[in-house]
Amino acid sequence: IQKEGLVENAAELGKYMLEQLYLLKEKHSTIGDVRGRGLLVGVELVLNQEEKTPANDLAEDVLYRCLNKGLSFKLSMGNVMTLTPPLIIKKAQIELSLEIIDQSLSEAEKAL
């Protein structure tokens, strides 16, 4: 872990991923919250920003759209996308993952 610099990689890329997800939150009203530490990140999907009504059906739709595009993650509590990439992930892979999430959210929001 030390030899490969995995802790530093997780801190650096985790910060980058959170910054990019905060930008996606500004674009998508269905993102109610983004939280995380290192490469463990949660993205809460909601129907209503003010009341934070959980968007379980939307989250499931986004999950399957992402899976069809090659991105796998876990849903927690029905509406929280739990992103836990490997510690060896590269920035380009995070960028691709974020593109997939952005596209899938846009598609699922239109289908609401």
Explain the meaning of each model-derived region.
Residues I1-L112:
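Conserved N-terminal phosphate-binding loop of PLP-dependent enzymes in the Aspartate aminotransferase
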